[in-house]
Regions:
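P-loop NTPase catalytic phosphate-binding loop
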Residues: 32-213
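Phosphate-binding and hydrolysis-coupling loops of NTP-dependent motor/remodeling domains
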Residues: 1-46, 51-52, 202-272
Length: 272
């Protein structure tokens, strides 16, 4: 009857959204950096269909657990691309402030730009990070010698650092530098590491064990029978298929079903 009375009325839109199966880093909001808090987007939350983010306070770190080809390494590259975008925006703000002749605005813009971290990456030749876009990492360290190399590099670091460590369960720490970072000895350095759940779990005295205690991270394509205890409990049944890049992000200790962002551009999907 209503359709007959109002034939030109648009059809009612479906109020139930659908979690996308792929999300580009380009569609994510800007990463935010301050001395006390970093907010780095990770993907789209199933419950809200809005972007969600890791929140890392001073001295905090995150872990992304998943099996090979689950999408965990790709997420590290996406993080790096978000930081690169933030740096470019900060540099543009400085240039605009200088061009305006406003000395106060220029100084404030410089201070904001100084809060954007450098991105250092630790990986080996088997890692998906070898295919990252050129220039996305400010420094690269080979997994085998990373402990000593990162320790030396930190002596020259002039500002904050986002340290991305792929397959952290295979990265030893003879110099105890990663352990020192996790304990808060370098408050301007935040680690986001990846690892395979079955390899992370038995590492009781490894530096990755301490990162998991922060309860910020993600479990990608989790096995509900074996991965329930990585950061906290997760639902045994998901409302959607847990395909590549899907899993549970732990935000402030609570699990959120997400589609993680991809490091690929919208126009070049499949290139990484």
């Amino acid at each position: 009857m209503i359709r007959e009375r109002f034939p030109q009325a648009p059809a009612k839109r479906d109020v139930i959204g659908q979690l996308p199966t792929w999300v580009s880093w380009e569609s994510m909001p800007a990463a935010e950096f301050s001395p006390s808090l970093w907010r780095i987007p990770v993907g789209i939350a199933e419950a809200t269909l809005e972007a969600c983010a890791f929140e890392l306070y001073e001295g905090e770190h995150a872990m992304v657990a998943g099996n090979p080809r689950s999408g965990k390494s790709s997420l590290l590259v996406a993080f790096a691309r978000l930081v690169s975008r933030a740096r470019a925006a900060a540099e543009q703000a400085v240039s605009a402030a200088l061009a305006s002749g406003d000395a106060t605005a220029a100084e404030n813009a410089r201070m904001d730009a100084a809060e954007v971290p450098e991105v250092w990456a630790v990986f080996d030749q088997r890692s998906g990070l070898v295919n990252a876009p050129e220039g996305v990492f400010d420094r690269v360290f080979e997994s085998k010698n990373a402990s000593a190399q990162v320790q030396a590099a930190l002596q020259d670091a002039a500002g904050p650092v986002l340290l991305l460590i792929d397959d952290g369960d295979r990265v030893d720490d003879p110099m105890n530098v990663f352990d020192a970072i996790v304990k808060g000895d370098f408050p301007d350095v935040h680690i986001i590491a990846t690892g395979k759940p079955t390899d992370l779990r038995p590492l009781y005295s490894h530096w990755t064990k301490a990162i998991r205690k922060f309860r910020t991270g993600a479990v990608v394509q989790p096995n509900v029978d074996t991965d329930m205890d990585m950061f906290g409990s997760i639902p045994r049944r998901a409302p959607v298929q847990l395909s590549v890049g899907r899993g549970y992000a732990f935000l402030a200790g609570s699990p959120v079903l997400v589609q993680l962002m991809s490091p690929e551009d919208s126009q070049h999907r499949g290139g990484l």
